[in-house]
Amino acid sequence: MTMCASRFSASLIVVAILCRMVIASPQAKLPDSAVSTAYQTGRDAMSRGDLPAARDAFEKAVKLSPHNADSQNMLGQVLLQQGEVDDAIVRFRAVVELQPSLAIAHAYLAQALETKGRLDDAITEFRIAVQLAPKQWQAHQSLGRALSLQNKTDDAIAELKQAIVLAAGEAELHDELGSLFAQESRFAEAESEFQEALRLNPDYEPAYFHLGAALSSQGETKKAQEMLDHALQLDPKNATAWYYRGVVEEAEANSDEALRSYEHAVELQPNVALIETRFGLLLERRGDPERAVAAFSKVLTLTPSDAEAHNNLALALLERGDAETALKEFQEAIRLHPDDSGFQQNLGTAYLQKTDFAAAISQFRAALKLDPEKASLHHDLALALKLSDDLPAAIAEWKVAIRLDPKLADAYYSLGVTLWQSGDFPAAAQQLRQAIQIQPDYAEAHYTLGTVLKQMNQLPDAADALREAIRLDPDFAGAHTTLAAVLRQLGDTAGAAAESRAGAEMVNRKNNLQAATFATNSGRRLLSAGDLDGAISQFRNAIRVMPAYALAHYELGAALNQKGLKDEAGGEYRKAAELDPHLIPPAPSGH
């Protein structure tokens, strides 16, 4: 389990820790009043946050007395805060040379080395600090944190345990030890440490957050949600807690709340690839490819060499209907990771969407060379062969897919459809029933079975299959219209008329939604291109076709807002929120 990395970063917290350490600070006697005055001037400047003035003063003190450890140390701290790490290391080494038995001097040097990424050298200095001050729990804590950065978790755990021996009442130590246990999937020990941290300090927010994340990893979603909500009450700006809350809500199949949690996380930490990725995947599953594309594009700005990120973006582009751009992203994913059969398979799917069946067949066969036992690949190859009118080869591939995975319902379904289209109705019905047996909620399989049975003149059974398809998917227009035809043949004219009306209404509604979605997506592209009036026109077209389409109202509000029509924009934002409460208007500028 990934925990909040900042909890373990020695570079972020060592100064605060060392300020509490009961280890002697450099106390070399200041040689004269000029040095003393410069040194005190620097301390005063630091206390008010004026780093340039502090640096000038400490540089003066060091120039006057190069062997004064206090001045060298303070100059090193200023340089470190200014990001001049190499120069800070020089100053801290000078302090160590002047006072080699001073633990805090080694700790400051370790901090600078760790900031530079020189973890081996940093750990060496932290170990010296521990040897010089073995009774100081903060020294063990700092060493443990540095060791965890090198993934030396067992050694880090040992140091945290020693820190707890010295200071059992410190909640943060139990929390950090619990986090290390969680990284090793030792969840029972982790939970015990988090609970102890909360016993010691019931308002210690990190322990609630870490306990929630640990419980989430164990599948205890209800308890995890309770802990994460408590953490967010204490710290509403904890982006990682919002992220884990989204994970928990997804596990509970509450996609609305999950989306809200991810939106908070992205807003608070807009440059974290993991959060953006999870956000994009949920958007894609919810049928919002436009926002998914934006999320995955953001991921690629953060991790341009991540093959999975290119693959995710390509899948979202496919869902948006942009197969041409998707092809390029799949090809880049394959370039970065050429042995991934899944990327190869997805590229074949993109060729299918472009109706380039020959390229799709070639791509699926290339993927099968990498993974010849992958049933879904044989299924996709069969589909491409069928679309190329090579039915015998397609049927053979579907049979291979079924042999490799007897539970692959899609293969039975596709084979059944192909046999039906070939005129072998009994064999088709057998395959469709097999698909339904494996996946009883397969609405399309019930619908197709009903259609096949209708053609076999088994009308009562056909009606039953079609009614089941409608029960599973009430908006399945084709099932309503086919059932209407079956009922008409059975003499149920009233039932047939009702189903016919329902089917027609659904077709009309679906067509309107498609038109509204197309117009809204067109408006978004025009808005991105700077054509404000064109975008507004397209959003209004979408609303005219489908007045209850919330996203069109929201996008129209955004466009009107950009044009300076604040009142009208506000009305559109309110309408969008009424239709979909998750479409929250942006806060007014200046707030």
Task: Map each language-model feature to its residues.
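Structural signature of tandem alpha-helical TPR/SEL1-like repeats
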Residues: 47-60, 81-94, 104, 115-128, ...
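TPR-adjacent "capping" and linker segments in tetratricopeptide-repeat scaffold/adaptor proteins
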Residues: 25-37, 504-518
